[in-house]
């Protein structure tokens, strides 16, 4: 079962409303009020459909209707409401006092839709052209930045000191034991030892020993844990043994060379005295 029709559609007037029909409809609604549109044509004596009577009253005959002359503010409101609600004209008309949904729909289709489409198209064109102009101006205004490097020669050695917390560890390790390039043997003579030997350069490698002594004596404020201290002590002992062995080798080489020199020197003196002997005898 469907919805029954409001009228039989037979013998009814169609087309434009006459002034007499408008007066009859207006007088009946002013007397009985709005509503019951299905029975209104029969009770008012009009040969019209109930829907036609309702639309005629709502869109033309109401006393509070504004007809034509839509202001700029109303146009902006219609545009914003259409973006929000779409083609729901009755809801849009409810937010515009005195305006009917039919009038707003007709005004939108004939004028406002074309205006909105033209503005949107113009914004798209402007949006495409402006970035191109900006990019060209930026390309012209941009200048290459030249970074000039400055050569710096380091003439001194700097030791960087870092402040560590109590819980931090020292990761610096002592350098490897110094190995002498020359090997000393007991057969080496005193003349084979270099005369330009620099004792300060030789002792410079033992700077780590003094630093380790300061750490162990408590002069250095840095704190070491047991494991790190044990590793340092082992490296220190190994370094000390290597240094002692090198010094002993150097000392023995010096002593052996001195003994050889004395022996060779004594023989030369004896031979020199022997040559002068006969002259004294004669």
Swiss-Prot record:
CDD domains: SANT. InterPro entries: Homeodomain-like_sf (IPR009057), Myb_dom (IPR017930), Myb_TF_plants (IPR015495), SANT/Myb (IPR001005). SUPFAM superfamilies: Homeodomain-like. GO terms for biological process: flavonoid biosynthetic process. Residues 271-282 have a biased composition (Gly residues). GO terms for cellular component: nucleus. Residues 9-61, 62-116 form the HTH myb-type domain. The keyword Cell division does not apply. PROSITE patterns: HTH_MYB (PS51294). It comes from the Eukaryota. Residues 258-282 are annotated as: Disordered. GO terms for molecular function: DNA binding. Residues 260-270 have a biased composition (Basic and acidic residues). Pfam families: Myb_DNA-binding. Residues 37-61, 89-112 bind DNA. Keywords: Activator, DNA-binding, Flavonoid biosynthesis, Nucleus, Repeat, Transcription, Transcription regulation. Signal peptide: none annotated. It is found in: Nucleus. Transcription activator involved in the spatiotemporal regulation of flavonoid biosynthesis specifically in the corms of Montbretia. Activates the promoters of enzymes involved in the biosynthesis of the flavonol kaempferol and the flavonol-glycoside kaempferol-rhamnoside. This is Transcription factor MYB1. It comes from Crocosmia x crocosmiiflora (Montbretia). The gene is MYB2.
């Amino acid at each position: 079962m469907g919805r029954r029709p409001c009228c039989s559609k037979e013998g009814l007037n169609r087309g434009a409303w006459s002034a007499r029909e408008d007066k009859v409809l207006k007088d009946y609604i002013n007397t009985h009020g709005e509503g019951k549109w299905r029975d209104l044509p029969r009770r008012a004596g009009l040969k019209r459909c109930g829907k036609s009577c309702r639309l005629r009253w709502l869109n033309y005959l109401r006393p509070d209707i504004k007809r034509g002359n839509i202001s700029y503010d109303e146009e902006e409101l219609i545009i914003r409401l259409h973006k929000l609600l779409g083609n729901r004209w009755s809801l849009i008309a409810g937010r515009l006092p005195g305006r009917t949904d039919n009038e707003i729909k007709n005004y939108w289709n004939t004028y406002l839709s074309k205006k909105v489409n033209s503005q949107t198209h113009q914004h798209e064109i402007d949006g495409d052209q402006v970035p191109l102009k900006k990019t060209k101006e930026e390309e012209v205004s941009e200048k290459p930045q030249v970074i000039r490097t400055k050569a710096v020669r380091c003439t001194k050695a700097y030791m960087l000191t870092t402040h560590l917390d109590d819980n931090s560890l020292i990761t610096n390790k002592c350098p490897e034991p110094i190995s002498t390039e020359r090997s000393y043997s007991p057969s080496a003579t005193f003349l084979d030892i270099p005369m330009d030997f620099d004792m300060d350069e030789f002792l410079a490698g033992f700077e780590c020993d003094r630093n380790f002594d300061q750490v162990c004596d408590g002069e250095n404020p840095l704190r070491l844990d047991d494991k790190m201290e044990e590793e340092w002590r082992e490296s220190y002992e190994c370094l000390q043994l290597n240094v002692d062995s090198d010094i002993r080798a150097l000392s023995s080489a010096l002593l052996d060379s001195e003994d050889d020199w004395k022996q060779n020197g004594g023989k030369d003196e004896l031979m020199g005295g022997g040559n002068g002997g006969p002259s004294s005898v004669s």
